[in-house]
Amino acid sequence: MPTIAELLSQELGQKLEYIENVIALMDEGNTIPFIARYRKEMHGAMDDTVLRTLETRLQYLRNLQARRDEVKSSIESQGKLTEELAAAIDAAATLAEVEDLYRPYKQKRRTRGSIAREKGLEPLAQAIFAQDGSDPAVLAEAYVEPEKGVNSVEEALAGANDIIAEDLSDDPAIRKSLRELIARKGSLVVKAEDPEEDTVYRLYYDFSCPISRVMDHQILAINRGEKEEKLKVTVTLPGNEGPATVCRAALKPTMFISQFVKAAAEDAYERLIFPSVQRETRSDLSDRAYSGAIHNFALNLKPLLMQPPVKGFVTMGLDPGYRNGCKVAVVDATGKVLDTTVVYPTFSDRKKQEAIEILSRLMRKWGVSHIAIGNGTASRETEAMAVEMLRSFPNASYMIVNEAGASVYSASPLAAEEFPEFDVNLRSAVSIARRLQDPLAELVKIDPKAIGVGQYQHDCPQKELDGALGAVVEDCVNAVGVDVNTASKSLLLQVSGLNATTAKNIVAYREENGAFTSRAQIKKVPKLGPKAFQQCAGFLRIPESKEILDNTGVHPESYAAARELLKLLGTDDLATLSARLETYGAAAAAEKCGVGELTLIDIAKELSKPGRDPRDELPPPVLRKDVLEMKDLVPGMELTGTVRNVIDFGVFVDIGVHQDGLVHISEVCNRRLKHPSEMLKVGDVVKVVVLSVDEKRHRISLSMKQVKKQA
């Protein structure tokens, strides 16, 4: 039997040595970001996505092995564990297969079959199931015992039927065959609870789809409709194939067909096996759909967090609103709040002009060059006001910012701690401004589920969702690196090796002793021990340090190697260091510097651009100076937009009209896609052509593949 490491090696297509190394590193308490970045030689430079998959599968396989051992121990305690059964349990590849094998030996609640056994009818059931041509009624006469509760031949036969049906239901081979049959030929059939009622689920009022072809988003929508008691859902098989599968397994291949056993097999199918396997099938479909939804949420979240920051500018944040007005915050280039106010542009034309005058004064007073506008209530009116104002500021521009989660953050204890003197509403304006300046630093303060780029995220298992999204946030923060002297506690909390206590202690140490001047000083933070320092040091940046390496992704353990590399290749032109290393030969240089080749390549990359931010290499966000309305759109119009969400059936694109347009999956490109994420991610800047506009239903249909045709 293959080991867990061997199974993972086969599944992931990675060398066994690398898999064993990663497992050992994880068991020693090393984090995924640390392993991915600083132990590349040990795993052949697997990226964090592969390492996360490995971690998940490792946990599953370890749980599977633990369950195998539990099941074998339980069966052995009953004196029923054979070598064949133990081998079958060890060979079971999934938890479902293990449970199938355990099913006959599990302690059950009282069933019709167990009651019949208590009445002493098991020998009768075995005799009938032998199918040797004996008449079941004649065999049953010997089991009529009123004192045991068997008052007639009919009652004896009914009990025997229940035992046979239960035994067939517990047969793992039969259940597996039926499961495979449903997967191949089954259909998911959906009907309306009330066909006359008009609901959002009308699309599924008369829906049927092969199990093998039903889409994840369809499963999630159907599940929600069923939960809300708007839909009825069943799994069906064609003709008589389900009962026939059980009968084939139950009946012996002889000239004589036992009608009694056939009837018991059909009863087992209808009453016990099919309802159970149908539930399992629905559960498997849901698990698949939830996994897909969580995967898509994670795919969408990563580029959203990794949006390029708009650095070095004084920024105005506008949190639109009607009754409570438009909240305004001006922050400097570092995110420090300079000014706040509230204006009421939607109350009247006079109030709108008054708002423009107030904002114009703030623009001039603080030298504002960028405006971030939240995309929520009253966003359209606020944008129109901003565009009118910007006619007097030709060098300024604006961007609509996704404000999802801003209100949640502004009312949180974290926001109260950060801005105790500000009203809740003004805090959200600050958050919106900072989202333009540094999306990652601001979004880490918010529960990822509140960011709003998921599909049915509230229906997904929350533990799995939280784990997947938490991993994305952690990977993004560590990929970028964190300035230890300016980072919030929320941001530090996501750094490899740090926890709530050490993150809080770093902030406290900074406030008490002033800015950190070296990475080595981080060791003085209370409760931050050697292991935590090892895991976090490479991801913490100190721009103020006299040691240039402290502002790079080079780990302190490799400082000597970095200095040796500079001695070897010179320090004249750091920007060309990577190219010069390639010319010299990375393998030869690595040997001289005393580190692995992959590590040295990373060191050269970091030295060539100290303080580099991987987000700066991505396309910048689309900033605007004017505004479009839906009525301005006409079919054939070409526009540039930003991908806001990627879901199973397409992508939603912000084209600057307050209503994201949909590029259906069939309009993304000329080849067939299984999922839009094969081509696109959140934050991508794309060219689209308008296909149709439905103002009444607020729907815009777009195409990417037809852009060239229109050119």
Features from the language model and the residues they span:
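C-terminal accessory/binding modules appended to enzymatic or scaffolding proteins
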Residues: 13, 308-309, 474-508, 625-663, ...
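Accessory alpha-helical DNA-binding modules that contact the DNA backbone or grooves
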Residues: 31-32, 43, 47-114, 119-147, ...
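Duplex nucleic acid-engaging cores and interfaces of nucleic-acid transaction enzymes
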Residues: 50-53, 60, 64-317, 321-421, ...
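Long, charge-rich intrinsically disordered scaffolds of nucleic-acid metabolism proteins
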Residues: 97, 399, 405, 410-480, ...
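Low-complexity, acidic/Ser/Thr- and charged residue-rich accessory regions of DNA metabolism proteins
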Residues: 142-146, 151-153, 207-208, 234, ...
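A glycine-rich phosphate-binding loop feature that marks nucleotide/adenosyl-phosphate handling sites
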Residues: 180-187, 318-322, 376-380, 401-408, ...
